[in-house]
Amino acid sequence: MNEVLRTYNLLIGYKGQPLIPEVNVSLCEGDIVALAGPNGSGKTTLFKTLSASIKPIGGEVKLFGKDLRDYSPTERSSLFSLVLTEKPDDLFLKVFDIVAAGRYPHLGLLAKLKTEDEQIIYDSLQTVGIGHLTNRNFVSLSDGEKQKVMIAKALVQDTPIIFMDEPAAFLDYPSKIELVNIMHKLSREQHKTILFSSHDLDLLLRHSDQLWVMAPHQPLRQGTPKELVEQGIIDDYFKPIVAKEEFYWMK
């Protein structure tokens, strides 16, 4: 498979203090990669570093073979979208306007939405199950609805790589199933690469091709879910949960 992103001795952290040892990982076209780890392990910092939202302490990130720093912000926004747990500051925007912002990398900030752009926006809202909220103020939504708005915004951005930090947070069970279906459709049919984080063990183990596991000040561990289970990595990090679960490769 074609490699779309690779890190070289990447150090992430703040004020010169690395959160974990050097990170050497890669993402390939069409893969769904899950990121696991306790709060404070550096998951959000890794997302922000890979998306150039913050600078690394050391090392480099290559996107499609080119140093991430050599892309302009406009170029980067056409290559990856980012869904964070942080929400927009201007909470009084309409749902439609927030999602529409995902189209601007394709149009330019001053360009007017075309009919086809508006249709893409409406389709994305329907895909995540909030078409009926198009004209609602963002501030009036529940946490789960706000999360769906941000996922819809990433969908309309239509990038080859999608980063999603805790996309299942605040979602009820039916909405989580919808999210899984969306990720698989994007990956298998449109060959998009998805990196998402979660504390949901079912999402991490059942619905990813690769799994990255982080812990404070520990090397990032990576492999298929099955490999990490067999190596005892999952047992080390999630022993209380795994003891109660039975996964298809354990049968």
Please give the residue ranges for each predicted region.
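Conserved ABC ATPase signature
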Residues: 137-141
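Conserved ABC transporter NBD signature motif
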Residues: 59-67
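Catalytic Walker B motif of ABC-type/P-loop ATPase nucleotide-binding domains
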Residues: 162-165
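Helix-to-loop junction immediately C-terminal to a conserved catalytic motif
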Residues: 51
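ABC ATPase nucleotide-binding domains
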Residues: 238-251
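H-loop/switch region of ABC-family ATPase nucleotide-binding domains
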Residues: 198-199
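The feature captures the beta-strand-to-loop junction immediately N-terminal to the Walker
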Residues: 36-38
